[in-house]
């Protein structure tokens, strides 16, 4: 495996590759990046889904103050003490504390109402619809836009794409619980300590390096070249970047593009760099 390298245009494109490698039990390592399901915004989004499905304490602690709801460490400690005394979940403790002095001036009531509303209504909605709605209505995506975190927003868009693909595969049997069980296989994956791993990295990271076998994937319009390209000079820079990626291979170069549709329903087309 150590002779194989998968360069990609942007970090969010690792999701599909990682899923396949994990499913096939092929060890890999990511250079200058974090595994897709280990990224903070992906963990946050999945924690919102878990809160809707089962309201577990770990997910609660992760997203109760994401975005900011003025429920800091001191208030979370109060909830943990109350939950221990009453033998209930942290979310139940918060629900019981909404009207108290300690939580006045916080977003506690709105957070409880948000989770309760989604929990009671999610059975009649697709998982992709629930995910898009909770990220919007919670204010999480708006927070990232305010921060100018485009890469994190791209990662969330890729997560939505993964949910859409899973729904397409499972059909009517795809419930929120089924999806969370499916994604747990990737979030809990253990790659072991072996150094014999496939290398994953961005094309920029690969500059100046060479590898026996290079697998350049996601060669689609809108991905490579990026959909953000608007000028001819920028397109020429993308072309040079594609050339850099292709010339990293010493023995074998494998180029691939993906057919089908994107999450927004648009068709996928091969990259102009393949034609």
Regions found by a protein language model. Give the residues of each.
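Conserved helicase C-terminal RecA-like lobe
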Residues: 11-26, 39, 46-275
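Conserved RecA-like helicase motor-core motifs
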Residues: 25-35
